[in-house]
């Protein structure tokens, strides 16, 4: 076959034209030309050569690349085809510009090759167009040249055939004729050419075949052709599968499900289950009673299946009067009275007709047999009702009388009576068809307030008939339940200083009875609280049970108010119960710190102190003492200097001890008189502050009064007596297990030696010193115990606590003073009547024993022995071990507390009593000092217990005989142990 002017020959040579420039540069260009010559296409070849020459002159190139080519796929040597050298691509600014997407193709400037840069999707780029090309413009400068490049994108088979829906529904009537055609929706393929040429295939079946219809310009479409009639009653629907395959390599397929719905025609008549139905029924049935429910079925569907029922034309008028038929459901019901004596059988003819066209009819016969029955039920009559019934009624009490009757005769007239189960009653037969309803078990209204008693009378007929009568038995209440509280006692917390009449709690008692028996009233169980009646503190509302505080409560006066509230009902006799209320009065910080005494003669909280200029750092100058009537953290006191004192001041105050000590040695620049303001703060909210003013006068060495040296021998004896204090401490710790036996022995010895010692010991002044770091204690009852030593004067400065004893006179308490020549008067004072125990001290006091009775101090030849750990009082700072938080601040007040402090500069010498000891169960440190009664300088670091203590009177100086007595006794004045 020769190559001529046919369209396919022209397409072949046009394709050669696109690549003519590449072919001329390759070795097989001559082969192509010779091929064209052999086929005699001289004119076409000449035209192609001219066209190629024109393309080279105009700078247009043609390439082709398949779609979906990978990145880097070779397209053509564009630089070589344009006649450009590789070395001049960069200098001449070689660049490629695309009118379409510019990132699909790219040129490597190193080798001048055009390659695929990103994925090319022909369907996305050109859609269903037969030709798809990418147009590029190649621009170079020096001189400026523009080349046009056309890259054809060849289609590949990368898209399967797709149907628009997953399932196609086709409606086919079962009466359709053979060869009926049903067009289907074809598939589409996004590819072009052979890749989009589709062929269809239908799944095998006996009813349909597939035919392909060629529509001009629209492709091929599948059509279903009916080859066999379909019976809807056998095959209501068919499911087929239509598959489309494209012509690409490899080929792709797509499928769609065909759902064929077969439409019904009226070709079936209704059918009854049976042609004759037999029914038996009793007489006297209620109107509209169902006789029979007929059912006729039709194999068709839709309106052809709907059936209507009716009496046949053969039915008599009596049948139409006595019975009704529902034309939709086929129910035959009674329309009047059916009496066995009137007729014992009926014959009913019924038709069933469908709604199809033409309508079809079915027939049946219903034979109804009437049976005689027991058609009279028993009758019940209730008389002589005795209601309501008290819940304490005795067993056997008659509640009601019952009579029964039945109009029937024989076995149908024999009646028996019964009650419902689980009721506390029973029936007692008194005569034929007469019964009594009596109480069978005890009643409890709180469990069940009323009973519904159902009396059932049943005859002996078959079937048996019965009648029922209800009796509502109400149980009358008896006051047999006392009011009950949910809990036996309640705990209430009330802050002190509450407003009068404030509601603090509500009690609630519930009475299980009813009406007035359940009406509860509340009242206080009166008693005395101290010197006052309980009703002066609280009251309770009689109806609501609300408890009110009638006056402001004071924690310092009353920490716990325990009382009972009584609840009584209004029954006869009245019943009641009590509940206990424990009202804890919570402390508030309503008491500021109170400074203890002053000795300077100035206003309260102000005193003077003489200090030698030669004292060094750490020397204790004085001590500020204060108490707080509150408890817990509200009574935990701390001391600090007022900021106005200045950083240059040589003084400082212990944070928790109140000791004023030197921070450095004094120099000439220090003023001779300095005024120190000490702030005493508690830890409450809000914080309350007291201010103490200390007037310090700096004097020379000779002007400071010095203690007499006569006390040195006595001091040596004390040092010798207590040389082994640490040994005693270790022994005391190790011998805890034998402490009880030792206590009993010491107690007996002390009691036996108490009487002789009274004659040989002078009356001294007891001084109990507290160096507590945590605030104050409340006042506790105390008694004076005197312990005598065989070597020295009687020691009367030991004191034991005993809550069971009456309070003894307490020595005056004041601020420390270093004035010379002052004697403390021996006149005792009665304690402040406001003093009382605090919660923290009571916890400690109950866990302590009297020092004498518990054997804590033991008198011996060398003086009393110490049986507890000791701490020196000379340590000026809190870190020396004196700081102890208050009870309630995280410290167990019922445990022994051993306190040690680093760097204690003062140690007890032999024969001395330790400066301080710790009472078990107490957070404070007790100091015991052995001093003569005529000591010139009062060192009474006395702990006061109480709400507020008046500032003590100034101590008067004593002269004359007392001074002479001091010399005779050989007692010397000692320095203040706090300094």
UniProtKB/Swiss-Prot annotation:
Limits of the Cadherin domain: 64-163, 164-272, 273-380, 381-485, 486-595, 611-707
Single GO MF descriptor: calcium ion binding
Record key words, sorted: Calcium, Cell adhesion, Cell membrane, Glycoprotein, Membrane, Repeat, Signal, Transmembrane, Transmembrane helix
Region (Disordered): 859-979
Glycosylation sites: 287, 295, 578
Gene giving rise to this polypeptide: Pcdha9
GO biological process, one term: cardiac left ventricle formation
Biased amino acid composition, Basic and acidic residues: 938-952
Extracellular topological domain residue ranges: 60-726
Transmembrane segments: 727-747
Keyword Transcription: no
Protein name per Swiss-Prot or TrEMBL: Protocadherin alpha-9
Listed GO CC annotations: cell-cell contact zone; membrane; plasma membrane
PXXP repeats: from-to residues: 763-766, 828-831, 861-864, 902-905, 920-923
Function recorded in the entry: Potential calcium-dependent cell-adhesion protein. May be involved in the establishment and maintenance of specific neuronal connections in the brain.
Compartments where found: Cell membrane
Residues spanning the signal sequence: 1-59
Main location: membrane
UniProt xrefs under Pfam families: Cadherin, Cadherin_2, Cadherin_tail
Organism: Mus musculus (Mouse)
Span list, region 5 X 4 AA repeats of P-X-X-P: 763-923
Membrane topology listed for this record: Single-pass type I membrane protein
Cytoplasmic side of membrane: 748-979
Miscellaneous information on this protein: The protocadherins alpha are expressed from a single gene cluster similarly to immunoglobulin and T-cell receptors. The N-terminal region containing the 6 extracellular cadherin domains, unique to each protocadherin alpha, is encoded by one of the large exons found in tandem array within the gene cluster. The C-terminal region, identical to all protocadherins alpha, is encoded by 3 shared exons.
